[in-house]
Amino acid sequence: MSAPVVIKALVASNTDIAEAILDAILSRPDEGFRLFCLCHNASPLHHVAGSLVELQLHLPKKRLTSQSRCGLVLTLHLPAEEAFPFLRGLTPLTADRLSTYLDRAGALRSLTPLVELLTLSAKKQPQGDARGRVAWLRPKIVGCLRRIYRVNISARWFISTFGSHEAQFVLVTAAYYFWGIPCTIETLAHLTELFTSESGQSLAAVTSLAELGEVFGSSAWAEQTEAFAHFAHEKLRRDSREIRAVARTIDAYRGRLPLASADLVRYVYLAHAQCFNEGTFKRYSQLTSMGEIGCLPSGGVVLPSLLDRGFAEHMRTYFTRETYLAEHVRVQQLKIRMEPPAPYTWDPDPDDGLMRAWAGLSVDVARELVELARWHADEGPTYPPTLQGFLCLAGQATCRGQWNPKEQFLPPTVLRRVQRLPVFLCHFADRHYFVMTAADPFSSHLAEVVSTPTNCRLPDTCLTRALSYTPVYYSQNSLSEQLFVSRHEYFNPRLPVCNLVLDLDLKIKGAPWSLEEIYDLCRTVRREVLRLMRRLGPVSRAHPVYFFKSACPPADPDNMEDVLPFCICTGKLGFRVITPLPRGHAIVGTSAVQGFVSVLQKLMGLTACLRRMRHKIKEIGAPLFDSGVYHAGRCIRLPHTYKVDRGGGLSRQLRLFVCHPEEEDKHSYVKNALNIQNLLHHSLHVGWPAPKTFCYHIADDGRDYLIQRTRETLPPTVENVCAMIEGHLGLDLVAWVSSCIWPSLMSTLATAVPEDKFPQFLHVTFEQTGPNLVQVCHARGRNFACLRHTHRASSKNVRVFLVLYYTSQAITVTFMSQCFAGRCGANQPTAHFSISVPASRIINRAEASQDSTTSQLARRRDRQDGSFSETLPN
């Protein structure tokens, strides 16, 4: 006798099916019991005609896994002719037929584990055979079945879960319960659209389980469930292979990209968007549909080849050192032969060794400039009584025979040989003094306090160790003496930049760096600086690049070693890097210098040194150089000087760190590093000719490429929220923020900021600074105290903004701040929190306001006509 044909069927009943199962096993059938077949996994039924059928009845489980979504409850052995009407949904199984064909022995065996579990801790064990034990525990077994299976389900639940049309319902139900496809119902529903283009009849009129079973049994798609299951398996395998291939492609390239965290997220997003955007997804879906998937190579992949070649080429060239400078950096220069911009014309080495300068506080500067404007308004240009005006005056040259406005500050005898003067800042007696210098013996003083070896034919690291400074621990007694230990140079945008002065801060983690590691970093910086300067003009291999390392903090006397390492800095390595621009070249303008620093930052990110030391760097891709020091009114500390603490203590002296590997004798290098003329922004290096070629633009064309491409792939937004608000509500942006948004922001602000920071927002005003930007201003000033930290200098220099982002669904208002302190990211915008206002609320409010206005006008008109006497609402 041939083996029976095994068919699985998902069943449901018109009564409590848990009770009905136990009744059938215990031969106590309910006469009103009916069992319906909802779906099955049988091949075309005419193929099994005349055979014996083993019909396995299953119920949906409550706890699902990809391999077990329904459970076997009963097994029937019956002829195929008896099974066909049930499987087609034509005839339900009655209690008598179920009892006739039921495999009771198998059913009792399937309940044995449940019986043993229920009697595990029972004091009195049930007696008798398996049937007797099941009868004894019948109520508990029924309760267990109800917890394991979905026993009370309706036709509406099946339709809403698996599909409201015939094709989707039939294919998804059979594949989900009987073929073990590891995916969700939603995925199977999407796969049916690739399997067949027809949807079949609607199931909206189906209300009973009997009708639902008849739909499945009579459907033409019931014979294609096995083919659909094979297609789904093949499609999911290919999808997984494609996704893994895309991930490998992205990850393999990502490992070579020195990106910051934000840029790394954008790159991954864009790379995936190239492969999974709408157009690509539709093309790939067409290639992997039922009729096309067999034509694809079995082991090949498709999606990685769909990456935008322009995007891939840009990423390759932009993040490769050899092609970045050549293809993505644009430099514009201009030669000026007649009266070109000139650097400082002062006396950096007076013969008598005396300093000639004017010094004063900010009030003194303002007073002198006001007096200058009052008495000499007709003799020359006027200067505003601010630091910018002071810098303009210091950098202004006058013609011979013309009155010099600097005579307001310095005697005419001093000004005979000088024109453009530097302006310094000096910290003395807890005050800031502004100093305009005409003659300065700073270099002579350095020769006295810095001891250099007579033999400079030493390796760079040995020469660095051989240098020694005479230490100074406290502020000096007079301002003239203090200028030798505390001095900052102000950047003057009116003058050309002849020496590139870089402020390098590298945040580190873990143990301090060794001397060799620091020297490797300096060599890398030197190499990239020279590489970039060659875009401006010719640069020799022995071009000087001076490094000044911030001195280490004092060692802990309790844990001091016998021999201290060269550096014990933790948290940050600070350097001042200074190099003259190519001979005859200079940079003019703040934007050009900042562009140079930005390109240098990108070059440093492409170096192997930083990637090799990434385990000792806090954040790869974080800015190394501070580009904010190249604005009017910003100053930077000079090499060899100290940082002045509160109370007058001196610390963190910037000391020379020798990095000049191209020359064996470094005597001239060390000598020039001690000359103030070589250390200032606008001073000409010793031995350099006056500049004739001026660079006025340096830009990285691909700097915002990732941001722009990300914006292009995001859903479109309304650029002008102000116009939208005014169009719907008739309110300007400031009035809308003040009346509708600020109360909600205040309730969130009370929990988002420290308690002592909240009162400053009780009285504020608003100022629109852009179409989507509103600045929050303090009632007694524009700015606020820092919301994140309590800084040493507790001045209120934090700007607060509300940034509005509008989509068709909602307006998102983000509360942001900018703090100037380095601890807060040096003026980097910080988002604190956001609230969302549904767009429907704005539209509804506008419509309500319009209806109210219309109603009031109508009532007013009616009352004037005399036809109505009701009054207007308040």
UniProtKB/Swiss-Prot annotation:
As recorded in UniProt, its EC number(s) are 2.7.7.-
Q: Where is this site: Essential for primase activity?
A: D503, D505
Which keywords does this Swiss-Prot/TrEMBL entry list? DNA replication, Host nucleus, Metal-binding, Transferase, Zinc, Zinc-finger
Q: Where are the zinc fingers (CHC2-type)?
A: 786-824
Q: Where is the composition biased (Polar residues)?
A: 848-857
The record ties this protein, via Pfam families, to: Herpes_UL52 (PF03121)
Identify the stretch(es) annotated as Disordered.
848-874
Assembly and partners? Associates with the helicase and the primase-associated factor to form the helicase-primase factor.
Protein name stated in the entry: DNA primase
Q: Which organism is it from?
A: Epstein-Barr virus (strain B95-8) (HHV-4)
